[in-house]
């Protein structure tokens, strides 16, 4: 399943988040990062594929102390076509 994660890092946590990101010591079991795009400030977006919502929850939980994350499920063109076909 495809997901978009929109994140916002609170100002007081920017340095800690940068340090954690620099070590890339994050658990990704069951999750594949497609890409990350960072704004100049404290926000960004990540595209990923997850086997299930538990894998996604575990991934996002490890960042929950430093930032707010909104998770949005996504569909491919093919999946949208299946929805439209009924």
What are these regions (language model features)?
Residues 1-86:
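Conserved, structured core segments of small domains
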């Amino acid at each position: 399943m495809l997901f978009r994660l929109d994140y916002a890092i609170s100002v007081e946590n920017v340095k800690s988040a940068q340090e954690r990101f620099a070590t890339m010591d994050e658990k990704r079991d069951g999750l594949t990062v497609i890409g990350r795009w960072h704004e100049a400030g404290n926000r960004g977006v990540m595209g990923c594929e997850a086997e299930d919502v538990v894998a996604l929850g575990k991934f996002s939980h490890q960042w929950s102390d430093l930032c707010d994350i909104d998770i949005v499920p996504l569909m491919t063109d093919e999946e949208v076509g299946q929805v439209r076909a009924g």
